[in-house]
Amino acid sequence: MTSFSTSAQCSTSDSACRISPGQINQVRPKLPLLKILHAAGAQGEMFTVKEVMHYLGQYIMVKQLYDQQEQHMVYCGGDLLGELLGRQSFSVKDPSPLYDMLRKNLVTLATATTDAAQTLALAQDHSMDIPSQDQLKQSAEESSTSRKRTTEDDIPTLPTSEHKCIHSREDEDLIENLAQDETSRLDLGFEEWDVAGLPWWFLGNLRSNYTPRSNGSTDLQTNQDVGTAIVSDTTDDLWFLNESVSEQLGVGIKVEAADTEQTSEEVGKVSDKKVIEVGKNDDLEDSKSLSDDTDVEVTSEDEWQCTECKKFNSPSKRYCFRCWALRKDWYSDCSKLTHSLSTSDITAIPEKENEGNDVPDCRRTISAPVVRPKDAYIKKENSKLFDPCNSVEFLDLAHSSESQETISSMGEQLDNLSEQRTDTENMEDCQNLLKPCSLCEKRPRDGNIIHGRTGHLVTCFHCARRLKKAGASCPICKKEIQLVIKVFIA
């Protein structure tokens, strides 16, 4: 019995060597599944597992069995596919029911050799040397006969009935071995496509609609014959393409001179980590900073209050938005409009006298002005110098207009001195602002570098933004740059 099984296995291995690899992977669908494949455009009766998966995807798309909103859900109730699956719906994220149906309705090429007529017909069509069932039996008998001749003296001759029993068992073992071999190959074919539950439309259209390409920032890579699209947006990384070469070289040299301690590798790491943050800051710098109404950086502390109408205005405004009064201490070269100045120390405008009131025959004193916090110290010194309670001249105010004129003239002189001091300080600040950028030395200083609660206005907006994107520190105090804003000087 052992000799017969051994010879059968040898004949099986010889026949397997004569079968082409393409025919080993081919399967024959059963009639219900074959109708579905033909409805999807398939031709013939022998297919590979990949072709069966392709035509199944085409069938689902043609019949529109999938949900339009959730396309991974396939509703096959009342359809031939639903009858084969034995269920009303399934999800392509879990294609195990579909694979179970294919294992039941696909017959491998080696299993079809159990029918001798079908095997001979397939051999004639494909012009392949595929042995029939009778040839397998004959080769097994010849090998067993030669084996028996060598052991003729030791083993007695078996009866005819026992020979038939041995042949029948031998055929069953042969078919079982072939069926197990091809079933394992069929399982391998399914495992090849079962990659994390890929959807049917991806499997069905992969070969025809997707080709590997590399174009710009979009790449299509292949992994085990399965396409994986990897899309990367590099528009934020290519911002320097829109700038001229001279600006890149000039600013690059200035950045290295400003911060010599930072290496190029550290700059690269910091720039990679802050790509998203720079993109957000660019939106604020380019669009929102151009409008005073939408400026998110202007707080209520920076606004100035008009002394005429008490309205708070933006620090970049020269005149009050409501009453059009000029802001005090704007610039020293501005002509002073005495009729509409919004100032805290007006000393030359007399008030209208109230009609019908008995007043002394002397010049009226000027009403106390609105004192801002920064002018409180100056006014306090002036009040100490001319305290009406301690001054002897206060007793003569009602009787002598000359003494009152003297006091008012001295007060005006002190106010003029304080105004001249503030004007000189403003002139120095204006001269510093009129200097060009400390990096490019071409553009004006309109880029304010913010770090914490302080900032430095030493560069133009273009160079300041380049420093921020490069991850460099402030060229003055070496602090980390948190924000760059554009300053408008009207």
Swiss-Prot record:
- In chain numbering, where does the motif Nuclear localization signal fall? 442-445
Q: Where is the composition biased (Polar residues)?
A: 130-143
> Where does each RanBP2-type zinc finger lie?
300-329
**Location(s), subcellular:** Nucleus
Annotated keywords:
Disease variant, Metal-binding, Nucleus, Phosphoprotein, Ubl conjugation, Zinc, Zinc-finger
Principal cellular location given in the protein's record? nucleus
Under the GO molecular function aspect, what terms does this record hold? enzyme binding; ubiquitin-protein transferase activity; zinc ion binding
Q: Give GO cellular component annotations, separated by semicolons.
A: nucleoplasm; nucleus; transcription repressor complex
Report residue spans for region: Disordered. 129-160
Q: Where is the SWIB/MDM2 domain?
A: 25-108
Residues with PTM Phosphoserine:
342, 367
Segments carrying the region annotation (Region II) are 246-332
> Induction: what does the entry report?
Down-regulated by cisplatin (at protein level).
| One annotated GO biological process | heart valve development
Under Gene3D superfamilies, the record lists: SWIB/MDM2 domain (1.10.245.10), Zinc/RING finger domain, C3HC4 (zinc finger) (3.30.40.10), Zn-finger domain of Sec23/24 (2.30.30.380)
Q: PTM details?
A: Phosphorylated. Phosphorylation at Ser-367 promotes interaction with YWHAG and subsequent ubiquitination and degradation. Phosphorylation at Ser-342 also induces ubiquitination and degradation but to a lower extent.
ZnF regions (RING-type) run across 437-478
Phenotype for residue 454 to M: In BMFS6; altered capacity to interact with MDM2 RING domain in a yeast two-hybrid assay; no effect on ATP binding; expressed at lower levels than wild-type; when expressed in a mouse model, leads to increased TP53 activity, decreased telomerase length and ultimately to bone marrow failure
Disease the record associates with this protein: Bone marrow failure syndrome 6: A form of bone marrow failure syndrome, a heterogeneous group of life-threatening disorders characterized by hematopoietic defects in association with a range of variable extra-hematopoietic manifestations. BMFS6 is an autosomal dominant form characterized by intermittent neutropenia, lymphopenia, or anemia associated with hypocellular bone marrow, and increased susceptibility to cancer.
**Partners and quaternary state?**
Interacts with MDM2. Interacts with TP53, TP73 and USP2. Found in a trimeric complex with USP2, MDM2 and MDM4. Interacts (phosphorylated) with YWHAG; negatively regulates MDM4 activity toward TP53.
Please give the function described in this protein's UniProt entry.
Answer: Along with MDM2, contributes to TP53 regulation. Inhibits p53/TP53- and TP73/p73-mediated cell cycle arrest and apoptosis by binding its transcriptional activation domain. Inhibits degradation of MDM2. Can reverse MDM2-targeted degradation of TP53 while maintaining suppression of TP53 transactivation and apoptotic functions.
What family does the database annotate? Belongs to the MDM2/MDM4 family.
Domain comment, as recorded: Region I is sufficient for binding TP53 and inhibiting its G1 arrest and apoptosis functions. It also binds TP73. Region II contains most of a central acidic region and a putative C4-type zinc finger. The RING finger domain which coordinates two molecules of zinc mediates the heterooligomerization with MDM2.
Note the PANTHER family from the entry.
Answer: MITOCHONDRIAL UBIQUITIN LIGASE ACTIVATOR OF NFKB 1, PROTEIN MDM4
Q: What is this protein called?
A: Protein Mdm4
Gene expressing this chain: MDM4
